């Protein structure tokens, strides 16, 4: 993408997409209603704290497994790495659920 600033000079606008997936296990959850409360709380915290898109992306009908995906657009890969490390630490520290799997991708 090429954009033109006030000076009329053309510069290239680079961006990176940082995407993450978390697979969590919450053994104390016995209903979809309980699970929904956890998912809503965690996704809202991720959105508010890190300004990312966050949603439950899989296993919606399974009580004890939570799969949450996040995505953000950042100006460069160093910022993407930093953001993903912060999100990872936050997810691990903000819920009693065990993190079974975590994936990170920068495009």
Question: What role is predicted for each listed range?
Answer:
Residues 17, 55-76:
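Short, charge-patterned binding micro-sites
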Residues 1-14:
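N-terminal amphipathic/basic-hydrophobic helices that include classical n-h-c signal peptides
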Residues 52-57, 100-102:
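A short linear hydrophobic-aromatic micro-motif
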Residues 35:
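C-terminal binding/interaction regions
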Residues 18-22, 68, 100-102:
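Hydrophobic residues positioned within well-ordered beta-strands of beta-sheet architectures
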Residues 72-107:
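C-terminal structural segments of small proteins and small subunits
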